[in-house]
UniProtKB/Swiss-Prot annotation:
Protein name: Mannitol-1-phosphate 5-dehydrogenase
Organism in which the protein naturally occurs: Klebsiella pneumoniae subsp. pneumoniae (strain ATCC 700721 / MGH 78578)
Entry EC no(s): 1.1.1.17
Keywords: NAD, Oxidoreductase
Broad class of enzyme this protein falls into: oxidoreductase
Matches recorded under Pfam families: Mannitol_dh, Mannitol_dh_C
Disulfide bridge partners, by residue number: none
SUPFAM superfamilies xref list: 6-phosphogluconate dehydrogenase C-terminal domain-like (SSF48179), NAD(P)-binding Rossmann-fold domains (SSF51735)
PANTHER family hit by this protein: ALTRONATE OXIDOREDUCTASE-RELATED, MANNITOL-1-PHOSPHATE 5-DEHYDROGENASE
């Protein structure tokens, strides 16, 4: 089996690429970072530090790399059995034209073998969004063939992969936590279902997507925003602050109540899942910076993302949301010189005031009680 993976960054190498290579799949990475491409093609291997209670170093071998812009990547799309991505939500649109070209070439070659495409991004139904971008780039005459032969498979991914702090300055070395979860929608595959250790198949993906979004992502973001306000450097420092931990756990319990109501999750099992997530935030081997986790606050405050979506669930079911609102207020305070969205957020609040700014970003009603509550919390933190 051959696979092409877009994104040779830390998540690509340390999570999805590693699982594919470990499964004996012939793997090629596609990226724009020439340093990483050259290193992969020189060595065809790299090291992954898996950190936790039992630390280990795994070697991933037998990998190749191509530029994600150019003919080579198009040729590969025309011949592989699986395409995966870990490029970040905003980059999906940029790789879609190359995928569209590769699919057109696949059709022209008369390849009837199915191809499945899986976007492994921190977003809800990312592959469905990628499919939209690919279809925008496809000529009309290819669309029916692509619909029949190409599976666009949504997934939920979960593994904390902080930026590498390699002592050797090796551009390929990567550190990951022990925990990983890759859940895919088995109803969307074309052809036989693949057997890849570490890939879990489900016919109820949205329950797992929202469980991860409402727990790991919600908790991670609120820890980062409260941590930044309190002057903490890392997620671990922040979650060990008892005041912050109380709000983060409270917010995850509030979002969890939505999940329990919506998907009939077992309350005790979900409480244990929350504790597992808190334990991951405390991992002393992950130097996860609050500024990195907090970046792109406009996206994280949008209606379908980790702060507002669980809040909307609490409003839908008439459930408490006090701690979620505290997290939203903290997100509005996020400032970073290195993040254009943080600067845009600050400018929007300065121009329109917190009430109108939050309503515009989140889609919440500016006159609603919940926006007033968030603005009160925001002003109290000034």
């Amino acid at each position: 089996m051959k696979a092409l993976h877009f994104g040779a960054g830390n998540i690509g190498r340390g999570f999805i690429g590693k699982l594919l290579a470990d499964a004996g799949i012939e793997l090629t990475f596609a990226d724009v970072n020439q340093t990483v491409l050259d290193a992969l093609n020189a060595r065809h291997s790299y090291q992954v530090h898996v950190v936790g209670e039992n630390e280990q170093v795994d070697t991933v071998s037998g990998v190749n790399a191509v530029s994600s812009i150019g003919d080579e990547v198009v040729d590969l799309i025309a011949e592989v059995d699986l395409v995966t991505t870990a490029v970040g939500p905003v980059v999906l649109e940029r790789i879609a034209p190359a995928i569209a070209k590769g699919l057109a070439q696949r059709k022209a070659q008369g390849t009837e073998r199915p191809l499945n495409i899986i976007a492994c991004e921190n977003m809800v139904r990312g592959t469905t969004q990628l499919k939209g971008h690919v279809f925008n780039a496809l000529a009309e005459e290819h669309k029916a063939w692509v619909e029949a032969h190409i599976g666009f498979v949504d997934s939920a991914v979960d593994r904390i992969v902080p930026p590498s702090a390699s002592a050797t300055h090796d551009p390929l070395e990567v550190t990951v936590e022990t925990f990983s979860e890759w859940i895919v929608d088995k109803t969307q595959f074309k052809g036989a279902l693949p057997t890849i250790p570490g890939m879990e198949l489900t016919d109820n993906l949205m329950a797992f997507v929202e469980r991860k979004l409402f727990t790991l992502n919600t908790g991670h973001a609120i820890t980062a925003y409260l941590g930044k306000l309190a002057g903490h450097q890392t997620i671990r420092d922040a979650i060990l602050d008892e005041k912050i931990r109380a709000v983060v756990q409270g917010a995850m319990e509030e979002s969890g109540a939505v999940l329990i109501k919506r998907y009939a999750f077992d309350p005790q099992k979900h409480a244990a899942y929350i504790q597992k997530i808190l334990g991951r935030f405390e991992n002393p081997y992950l130097k996860d910076d609050v500024e990195r986790v907090g970046r792109q606050p406009l996206r994280k405050l949008s209606a379908g993302d980790r702060l507002i979506k669980p809040l909307l669930g609490t409003l839908e079911y008439g459930l408490p949301h006090r701690n979620l609102v505290k997290g939203i207020a903290a997100a509005m305070h996020f400032r970073s010189e290195d993040d254009p969205q943080a600067q845009e957020l600050a400018a929007l609040i300065a121009d329109k005031g917190p009430q109108a700014a939050l309503a515009q970003i989140s889609g919440l009603d500016a006159a609603s009680d919940v926006v007033a509550e968030a603005v009160n919390d925001y002003n109290a933190e000034k």
